Amino acid sequence: MPGATLVRPPPVDPSKSPMETVLELRTLSDIGPDIFTNARELWHPPGARGLYGGAVISQCLAAAQETVPSPSPENNRAVFLIHSMHCYFVLAGDASIPILYHVERVRDGKSFLTRTVQARQRGKCIFTTTLSFMRENSGDESTVDHGWDMPEGAREGLDKILRGQVDGDDEDAGPNGVESRGPFISKILGIADNHSPYPHQRKPEAWVKCRGSISPSGGQHAHLAALAYMSDSWFIGTVSRVHGISRAGAHLYNEIFPPTTRYSSGQAEASKNTLRTPEGARVGMMMQTPWSGQGRGLVEQRIWNKDGRTMY
């Protein structure tokens, strides 16, 4: 759509996955330092007030990652990876006009880096986030390690998709320059403990995966941006889903969420483990809502990789 980007979208690179193509950014150095914009039109889900929130989240992450120093002799080959991201949706985004991502380098330390990113349209902030990057392997031997076990239903569903035994649903069918299909597919596996009389005990389970494989050139940063994009797919409908009502009629679009979960008015994400392989772009997820009321809902989401390891 004309006007959806500031610059003409580049040709599609066949060596990259559809997800990488969708999430491409362009640097706007002529406007100012650390300013980026979407290279392609972003998806507006049918019936939604604004564009897909996962696109804004993932492009903010990608923009911040562009300002993280690469390993070099000057920093002792340090690798910094995202470990915390606190987000707020301020206004509904418009897919028909470009987004400018303004990154501020708040702090560069030896073990942690801090960035803030504002996504702006027509001079107004539509989304803001604070991100913290942690130096890889900065913990000593005294650190402890634990995580939630992947639910059996999610594990079985993920095993089937890895073997190609289950078809998924197109989640993003928007005009993204990558055929008419979206960059990932997903499927709801069911609701664990759906027999419970208490909605807060019912837990929807799903799996998602990228179409194709993330390219070697995309690396860890592309995997993390892809995870951010996909993790928003089933999240917002959790409250209405556990109540067995239509999301469209539930009026629950202003959901707020605590740390290690996702989406809408406020959200926070703690990334525990990074994605390192093409297979890592296939993940299982489980959502749970401990409370809803006054037109709002509290939702928690957990994500596991194909090996059942907690990602966040």
Say what each PLM segment does.
Residues 2-312:
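Terminal targeting signals and extreme-terminal segments of soluble enzymes
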